[in-house]
Amino acid sequence: MKREDEKINVWGARVHNLKNIDVEIPRGSLTVITGLSGSGKSSLAFDTIFAEGQRRYIETFSAYARNFLGGLERPDVDKITGLSPVISIEQKTTNKNPRSTVGTTTEIYDFLRLLYARAGTAYSYVTGEKMVKYTEEEVINMILTAYSGKRIFILAPLVRNRKGHYRELFENMRKKGYLYVRVDEEIKEIASGMKLDRYKNHNIEVVIDKLQVRDKDDERLRKSVETAMRQGDGLMMIMDKDSGEAKYYSKRLMCPTSGIAYGDPAPNKFSFNSPEGACPRCKGLGVVNLVDQSKIIPDDSLSIYEGGIVPLGKYKNQMIFWQVGSLLEENELSLKTPIKDLPEDVLNDILYGKIEKVKIRKEVVHTSSDYFVEYDGLVKYIQQAIEDESNKEAQKWAEQFLTECKCPECHGGRLNRESLSYKLWNKNISEVADLDIKDLDQWLTDAEAHLDSKNKRIAEEILKEIRSRIHFILDVGLDYLSLNRQSVSLSGGESQRIRLATQIGSQLVNVLYILDEPSIGLHQRDNEKLIKSLKDLRDMGNTVIVVEHDRDMMLNADYIVDIGPGAGRKGGKVVFQGTPKQMLKQDTVTSEYLNGRREIQLPDHRRVGNGKSLCIHGASGNNLKNVDVEFPLGKLIVVTGVSGSGKSTLVNETLQPILSKHFYRSLKEPMPYESIEGIENIDKVVNVDQSPIGRTPRSNPATYTGVFSDIRSLFVNLPEAKIRGYKPGRFSFNVKGGRCEACGGNGYKTIEMNFLPDVMVPCEVCHGKRYNRETLEVRYKGKSIADVLDMTVNQAVEFFENVPDILRKIKTIQDVGLGYIKLGQPSTTLSGGECQRMKLATELSKRDTGKTMFILDEPTTGLHFEDIRILMSVLQKLVDRGNTVVIIEHNLDVIKLADYIIDMGPEGGRGGGQVMAVGTPEEVAESGKGFTSRFIKEELERVR
């Protein structure tokens, strides 16, 4: 019999739809929690076990500290025992900060900064020479050797290439007793009131001494060098009096030719989040927003009068048009001249302004007069609007004319030129951070071999830390990422695996880890590595709980908890808990898919499509290798390939933005491509993702699908409503009139509990029904509007069977497998998979033209085998209507149902970006090209 502390026991869990369940999970195991979408998996793993672990941790804080923290709410559970400290690793890409990168998240970049600060070699950003550094004694010996017997000036640099009159500086030097300065390579006596041209750049050195170099024991030389170093902040200059040649010497890192000096390198110098290291132009972001001429003039066949310059619009009797008109008249042109016929210099004057003032003629009652005004150009006007923080409306207007470009100063390196001048084995830190992780691993090996013995000793421990973290990232299948990759650009699965690698690297023990589908976005090729990583985490002495649907993950687990049997109200029970071996003998939905008794069937035939296609030529964004890709229309298309092979770049970053820009004038710019053909063969594009369908509890399936408007119209037309003169707004809980004013139509009240979490209690007036008594008195078939919102979709289908407009919309919700959810259920409680299917239901309810392209990125995220079967049947219906569905997917249950596959590869990152194979699943399987073909072949053989 197991001891109590060898397992995690959950008694009486009732969070969301959980039916007072008891669960036992062995400690030190890899446990998979599985079940249909909406069955209660996340409610058990995250909202019960993790929430209680988090609450216990926060309870250790003082009451004062708890006042500033959320997350104290106790989950609805009787008791949980055996909990360790809990760490949750979810799919959500929570970090939207553009400064967060793979390198900063994994802490590899922190160690890399330390490596460059301790072992990097500095080079001059002016000449490219290696920087030098001397002690005072070495400087004196070098002067004695180089200038023996010569007369020299000893100078201290004060100003380097800066504007100003410097009157105060000269006066200060004069008061200190100095008689001469060298200004712009000319020795001058410091006169009272001396000043320079304030608008020119100047170099100023103060003359510390002039002497003849004699022997070693020259005390005067020694003291003068010491003073010069002090006045010049570690930098000094020696000038030969006869030849006028000058040479720099420094106690700091210095360029022997130009004299520029660097401070001693510290790790902060290599941080783009620190003022010491960040590029001054882009502030460490690597990109800047610049005004894009193609957005200002999208159609140069139009004239300015016709609105050819978008920021100006069509002609108006305003000063800006008078100024532009005068510019054109000077060149014998007019506002009605097509922009393409304007000379380049005239167009530049209009966009960027003119140095000379513009002459404007003002005519008043048969008399005219000329006056001159300054004209700064449209681009400057747009830039001023962007910089004006006080006028958000003008900022938003100006943003449409900007394009994000690489910073022209650091060229995307994020750091200032001094920081980018430190190198290790011919690469600066930004170049190293741009390498794929697998290339970085090789570079570290090569760099270490080229270090001298002193630096090798210094770098040994740092390299060890970097390497261990790199290997953890390689183990979770992310070898194609670079350290400079922004966290915000990672998919949910990538983001989660990065955090997983970071946790493995932290070497914590006796911790409970809870992960949400770590296999999402991972090709079958890399699945084994991920499972090994999770087992390594377990073998360190941790307990790992994974919410997962992946077949291999379940079969490799130590323990499985299956929640079901259905979803929503029909779920929330433990249908099985035990080992995978025991699971295969059960008759649950999950076990039947695992042991092959139930299967997602292959289609009888592959569609031939409508004979038309959409072709992208020369796609070269990110790692795409100038590829030409054809999307045959009227088919179910699946884009496959290993992680990082270019699938998302092709579909989400190239295809979708092209279509969105064409149909909806989207501001998102597509990745580079040469041309697109066949766009006339479709009439719209719809992206069906798993993002929430509403951000507040007021949003619900009825409002999202639009069926609530029809339901309110039905109630308005009832005799009782007509007698009372009710309008549709009477049946809305969002506006005054029909809603309960005591709770504002929420159905509950929030009670603030100071340092305890806020408590939500049902409204004592409407008892959670949201409406006032008078509104609830209007009934249809004995049900009030509140009763209708409390119905499940299945109940509503029966209830409204005689109302075609309402039935059509709610029937599609039922058809996508969401019959169990309530019409008035808050959108915030729906899972990602449920949100996605809700969006599909909305599209299905529309009367489409059969020329729509639907785009889905990994729609199987969070979906059980049975959910995938339902989802795919919905997508097949969309294609049967003549539409085209494009899916990015790794799941073989989806891939095998495709009419057409586009397989990207062969590897991820720089090794990818090519089209490996296209055609039906059978054709791709037989091609033998790419990694996907082998897995498709095995899957087709398994199901036949």
Annotate each PLM feature.
Residues 1-944:
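Conserved phosphate-binding elements of NTP-dependent enzyme cores
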